[in-house]
Amino acid sequence: ASLGVTGHVVVTGGEPLIWLGRGLEDLACRLRELGAVEVETSGVYPPSAGLDRCVDYYDVSPKLSNAGVKAPLHPFYPSSPKAWFKFVVRDEADVEEAAAYVEARGIPRGRVFLMPMAETPEEHSAVLRRIWDAALRHGLRVTPRLHIEAWGNARGK
């Protein structure tokens, strides 16, 4: 704030919550002085009370079977009004799996977004067409990946 910088800071990386008790809380609280703090997480680890005080939003990305890993969702997140959920999907079967996941864990549908798994603009458009109707049927939002539309999978954009 002393530099005149304000806004929204996203703490991301493999899994930021592995740094609980090792500086993450202090970092988040210091960043909070600059504006809103969002933490991206798989949802496996719950935040500490100290971290939760300094975080405005959790961007929770539970893993579906298309990710090739099984990671349990901690019960903190479905009940937190700060948590928003993003599922990476490639087809109707993934949408069905995400909808079942949301239902089974009591995640509010209004806090759920589906994001196309794609690396090129052409693939992105194709995935959007494949998932759209299933998303509507389940009352789930779809968020496009505009950087893929603009630049494909180019780094640094």
Model feature map: region roles:
Residues A1-V10:
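Conserved alpha-helical substructure of the radical SAM core
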Residues V5, L17-K157:
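Conserved AdoMet/S-adenosylmethionine-binding subsite of the radical SAM
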Residues G13-G14:
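Active-site beta-strand/loop signature of hydrolases that rely on acidic residues for catalysis
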